[in-house]
Amino acid sequence: MSPVEESPEEFLARFAAHRVEVRLYPEPWGSPLLEVQTPAGFVYAMDRGAPPAPVGEARVLFHGLARKVARAQGKEGVFREGAAYRLVGTARPLEKGFYLLLARGLPVVVHWEGPMPEEGEVLLWPPLMLFRE
């Protein structure tokens, strides 16, 4: 299996077309976890950018590693389950091993080695990751 990313900068450049406008909220200095207001509501994501994280409007890329993938059973959305997120939405392939899952207006680049249904339900491994410039 090849690495999922070469570097945060390379990953962001590779999938930059799938960034989304969000609002970042202040976190304690040095905290890697960001509180983010997205089109789908608030999420917590691990910041893959250099400190300090900006506050306010930003264009960011969300990325997650899929633990389980199934055909969508519930309503579309982004649901927190402990430290993990369950995404339910529309998926489309980007390149080998990567899909774009759109859940209530929130695009997330998901890594999954197998096939993903067009209407998918994905349980991510924690953490949900956020890439920014």
Predicted regions and their residues:
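Acidic (E/D-rich), amphipathic helical modules within compact regulatory domains
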Residues: 28-74
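Noncatalytic linker/hinge segments flanking ATPase motor cores
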Residues: 63-66, 75-78, 127-132
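OB-fold (S1/OB) nucleic-acid-binding surfaces
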Residues: 25-43, 93-109
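Structural detector for short beta-strands of small beta-barrel domains
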Residues: 2-28, 76-97, 122-124
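A short linear-motif detector with a strong N-terminal bias
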Residues: 1-2, 13-15, 38-40, 70, ...
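Short, solvent-exposed interaction modules
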Residues: 68-117
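Mixed-charge, glycine-accented linear interaction segment located at domain edges/termini
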Residues: 107-133
